[in-house]
Amino acid sequence: MDSNPFLYHLDGRTVLVEQRLDNLPRFRGRRNFTIAHEIAHQILYRLFPDAYGMQRRTLCDYRRSSKPCKQITDWAEWQADTLGAAILLPEDAVQEGMFIFGLGDQMTVLSKKYSPNKFEAFCRMADFLGASRTTLSFRMEQLGLLERNLLCAR
């Protein structure tokens, strides 16, 4: 650890997870995605060491805030988000979850206001799968299982 208590030198094999994500059940989905996201960085770096920029990431300021549903501007982060979501939520698990929770083959809109029953079923599905609502909605969009996502209005 550096002399600054908020900066850590990362060796490329260490995952730094915020302590508040560790024990609280309401952060379980976010914690699981954070770990999957960091695993995705490692996979991408090992597959594409010359093209992937992990070697430049040696310091992490854990106070950096990240707003939910933010627009992705960093290609490496987008790749890790996408692969992390696929690791955490394989297509067959998402489709089976949609069946179990009565969401059909596809959702037209994800909205607490416009379709509260489906929204509640979606929330139960996210909890069941150990994913955050944001990650599950992102993955469903990737898979073409969600047409309009009002959870993260862009």
Residue spans of the language-model regions?
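Active-site hotspot residues in diverse enzymes, especially metal/ion-binding acidic/histidine motifs
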Residues: 1-154
